[in-house]
């Protein structure tokens, strides 16, 4: 936890608003890619970015920045995972626009998920269940629970990295963009729900209640 986070109490964001902040940039990306030619005709400045995928990338970067700023204004904190993901969006998005090569933005999920997976699984090698630092405010688990949950999420992130590589290398750009919204997100939600039995089994709050 940074000194800024420690100095000011965290303000909880409603689950619905949190979902909007997380899904908003992805929805902008999907809409801009599917309506890129229309946007280019309506807003000549966007046409300067290039084709639909480049317009979508530029607006995705702007929407990501807006979501991070909104999160900071409301909570005075920036969650680690959205922050890291945002930084990668800005770097790879800038490369995409500068070089006019959509490979960079397509590889962004691969880089982010590989990074998260490697950090989580690597932390276990040093006896650290780093996932606990991310979700500790949401729920409390015993040491074994955090270890198992960290392993599962670490492997899941690596799975998403491989899946992204398969999708963008094997299918069209439009399919890849749609899969980011309508494929990856439902898979992640289902995986999260599947962890509830583990969380309930190792919950310290449940133990204290008993």
From Swiss-Prot:
Coiled-coil blocks: none
Keyword Ion transport tagged: no
Cellular-component GO terms for this entry: plasma membrane
InterPro entries for the chain: YciB
Pfam families: IspA
Transmembrane regions listed in the UniProt entry: 12-32, 53-73, 78-98, 115-135, 148-168, 175-195
Disulfide bonds: none
Presence of keyword Protein transport: no
Keywords recorded for this protein, A-Z: Cell inner membrane, Cell membrane, Membrane, Transmembrane, Transmembrane helix
Compartments where located: Cell inner membrane
Membrane topology: Multi-pass membrane protein
General function of this protein: Plays a role in cell envelope biogenesis, maintenance of cell envelope integrity and membrane homeostasis.
Annotated family: Belongs to the YciB family.
PANTHER family: INNER MEMBRANE-SPANNING PROTEIN YCIB, INTRACELLULAR SEPTATION PROTEIN A-RELATED
Identification of the protein by name: Inner membrane-spanning protein YciB
Gene: yciB
